[in-house]
Each structure stands twice: as C-alpha cells, then as structure tokens.
UniProtKB/Swiss-Prot annotation:
Name by which UniProt lists this protein: Large ribosomal subunit protein bL35
The organism's place on the tree of life at top rank: Bacteria
GO cellular component entries: cytosolic large ribosomal subunit
Matching Pfam families: Ribosomal_L35p
UniProt similarity note: Belongs to the bacterial ribosomal protein bL35 family.
GO MF assignments: structural constituent of ribosome
PANTHER family: 54S RIBOSOMAL PROTEIN BL35M (PTHR33343), LARGE RIBOSOMAL SUBUNIT PROTEIN BL35M (PTHR33343:SF1)
Keyword hit for Zinc: no
Single GO biological process annotation from the record: translation
Keywords attached to this entry: Ribonucleoprotein, Ribosomal protein
C-alpha cells in the first residue's frame, strides 16, 4: 500500500494544536491595507482555529499531521 501524499499547500497553511485542532492565519492582511481600519487589521493579526465544519477537509489534506 503506497503512502498517502500530503497536500503541500495545506501543510504550509495549517499547524496542528495539542488539542487536535488546527491553527490558521486570517485572510485580508496582505495588501491594500490603507483603507482598512487599525481595529480591523489588529483583529486579523492573531491566529484562529479551523472551524468544525472545515476540520474534515484539513485532516484529509494532512494525513500525517
């Protein structure tokens, strides 16, 4: 039985947490930042958890995480 390939794009975007979840970065913080408020940018800064509905997709992309 061959090994399952990891989706490399997902491996770079998600990190496994000790509790079995996954950390992810928020979108909308790369460019065109002048029109976004300081509060909005500040709230986008910290990492977030992958939601329960998306967790199955992330787990399927990262079989060895």
């Amino acid at each position: 039985m061959p090994k399952i390939k990891t989706v490399r794009g997902a491996a770079k975007r998600f990190k496994k947490t000790a509790g079995g979840g996954f950390k992810r970065k928020h979108a909308n913080l790369r460019h065109i930042l002048t029109k976004k408020s300081t509060k909005r940018k500040r709230h986008l800064r910290p990492k977030s958890q992958v939601s329960k509905g998306d967790l199955g997709l992330v787990v399927a992309c990262l079989p060895y995480a």
